[in-house]
């Protein structure tokens, strides 16, 4: 099977957008029935329901972003630089190399009206570490030896070992002391400090109301997160004035037709998140680094970025995006189908058959089918399987796959790679779903966690990137821009570099 050249793919992409033009034209021929701004919440479209609204257990992208509207940590990450800034904390100071003193704000209360103080911080950190709670984020606090309340407004945190990312880790949502170790609350009923409180969740929507006394000034508008699986339905909802915000949910092929309609605009910024292909290394030939490297050689990243992704992505040369402080300069990952075919033959893997998992998003399915065709050209038969996100995550955690296309969520700190690649993070302890077991990689991940000097850490991650170019435990694909489509009333909205939605609270 021969792969269509790039011009043909561009033509097919344009044709796909044309399918929706008559519907949009019909809509634009009618008066837009946009409700008055104060009459309805700001509607944010999402492609899937959050798996849970409990910040102790959430791991999916929609759930992570939703819970960060409801809950707040001691710090938050700067929307542009991703550096830690005071949030529920007033400030902090290092007493020595392993002891951090955090002072708390006195103008913040929980949604219920309960006061916020040091005992809540201490209880939260202990709960996230507790095996009885079973938080998926327990690793974030595993370097904390103790947390003690010096007084109602001061917490002293002591580390058990050098740990470079403590301040970033304190972005962890703070819960009320009497709820921190409570049973799971997937409905979002845990008391929070964020700018919104959950009113209702279920039936494809999460309704959030502005909160008084939170870490931010009270937002002007309520927010509803609306699950709409089909891209055409999303576009029509935006055009009709029913929805206000869609982040990374309108494909490049459809975007120009949608933006031609009145009352809609788009913003774009470089993203910090990596789209990659995960490899199940315990499955036969996929455990061979030569095979994984050959699979990488088969993939024409630049062609997909320029066509299917509409130029709104940059081919990946490694795990960290170019704007990231830990990015290591290096040549782009090559595309060489002939060499890939030879290396597969040398490894005895020519003709192997694999299952390639992806989400039900139309664009993701299109991308997966192009990647499968490129793999077919080098002698690998990839059967594309599209799944709802919950089903897909369950299969990944169980190891029931060969290849899968994923996005590393919120690549704010390279230490997050420990959760996805360290041998101690194989599910259910973490998200090392490829079952990577590499002592050299573990050592570099551990070193990056404990080295405090930023220049020394950058050197550690440069060595890690060099190792990954040899081993290809994951196959980096590209870094996608954060692209938002907004209504006139939400035109000031822009997501942060890692894709969070806190700017919703600033919509006038």
Residue positions per predicted region:
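N-terminal lobe/hinge region of extracytoplasmic solute-binding protein
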Residues: 45-96, 126, 191-192
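Aromatic- and charge-enriched surface segment that lines or borders ligand/interaction sites
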Residues: 91-134, 156, 237, 285-287
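Surface-exposed binding/hinge segments that line
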Residues: 93, 103, 137-180
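Gly/Pro-rich hinge or "lid" segments in bacterial periplasmic/extracellular proteins
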Residues: 162-218, 222, 230-232, 337-338, ...
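Ligand-site clamp/hinge motif
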Residues: 211-256, 381
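Append "and occasionally in soluble cytosolic enzymes with long acidic Gly/Pro-rich linkers
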Residues: 287-373, 463
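Extracytoplasmic/peripheral linker and loop segments enriched in polar/acidic and small residues
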Residues: 383-392, 397, 419-488
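Long beta-strand-rich cores associated with HINT superfamily self-processing modules
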Residues: 484-508
């Amino acid at each position: 099977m021969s792969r269509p050249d790039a011009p043909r793919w561009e033509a097919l992409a344009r044709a796909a957008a044309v399918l929706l033009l008559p519907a949009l034209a019909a809509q634009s021929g009618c008066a837009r029935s946009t409700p008055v701004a104060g009459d309805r919440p700001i509607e944010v479209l999402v492609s899937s329901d959050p798996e849970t609204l409990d910040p102790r257990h959430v791991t999916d992208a929609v759930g992570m972003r939703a819970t960060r509207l409801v809950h707040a940590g001691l710090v938050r990450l700067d929307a542009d630089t991703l550096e830690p800034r005071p949030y529920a904390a007033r400030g902090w100071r290092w007493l020595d190399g392993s002891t951090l003193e955090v002072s708390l704000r006195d103008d913040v209360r929980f949604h219920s009206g309960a006061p916020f103080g040091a005992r809540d911080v201490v209880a939260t950190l202990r709960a996230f570490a507790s095996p009885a709670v079973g938080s998926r984020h327990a690793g974030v606090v595993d370097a904390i030896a103790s947390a003690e309340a010096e007084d109602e407004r001061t917490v002293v945190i002591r580390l058990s070992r050098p740990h470079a990312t403590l301040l970033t880790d304190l972005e962890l949502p703070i819960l009320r002391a009497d709820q921190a170790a409570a049973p799971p609350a997937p409905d979002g009923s845990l008391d929070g400090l964020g700018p919104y409180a959950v009113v209702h969740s279920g039936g494809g929507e999460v309704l959030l109301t502005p909160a008084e006394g939170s870490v931010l000034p009270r937002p002007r508008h309520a927010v509803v997160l609306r699950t709409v699986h089909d891209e055409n339905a999303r576009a029509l909802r935006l055009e009709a004035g029913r929805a206000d915000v869609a982040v990374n949910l309108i494909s490049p092929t459809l975007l120009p037709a949608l933006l031609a309609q009145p009352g809609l605009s788009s913003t774009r910024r470089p993203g910090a998140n990596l789209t990659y292909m995960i490899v199940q290394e315990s499955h036969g030939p996929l455990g061979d680094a030569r095979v994984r490297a050959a699979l990488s050689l088969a993939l024409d990243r630049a062609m997909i970025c320029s066509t299917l992704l509409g130029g709104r992505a940059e081919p990946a040369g490694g795990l960290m995006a170019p704007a990231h402080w830990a990015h290591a300069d290096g040549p782009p990952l090559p595309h060489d189908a002939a060499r890939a075919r030879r290396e597969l033959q040398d490894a005895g893997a020519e003709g192997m058959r694999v299952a390639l998992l992806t989400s039900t998003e139309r664009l993701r399915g299109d991308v997966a089918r192009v990647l499968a065709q490129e793999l077919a050209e080098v002698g690998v038969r990839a059967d594309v399987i599209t799944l709802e996100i919950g089903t897909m995550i369950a299969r990944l955690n169980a190891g029931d796959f060969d290849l899968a296309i994923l996005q590393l969520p919120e690549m704010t700190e390279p230490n997050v790679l420990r959760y996805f690649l360290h041998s101690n993070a194989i599910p259910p302890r973490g998200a090392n779903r490829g079952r990577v077991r590499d002592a050299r990689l573990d050592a570099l991940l551990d070193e990056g966690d404990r080295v405090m000097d930023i220049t020394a850490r950058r050197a550690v991650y440069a060595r890690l990137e060099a190792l990954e170019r040899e081993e290809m435990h994951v196959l980096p694909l590209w870094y996608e821009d954060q692209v938002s489509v907004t209504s006139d009333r939400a035109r000031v909205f822009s997501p942060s570099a890692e894709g969070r939605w806190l700017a919703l609270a600033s919509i006038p």
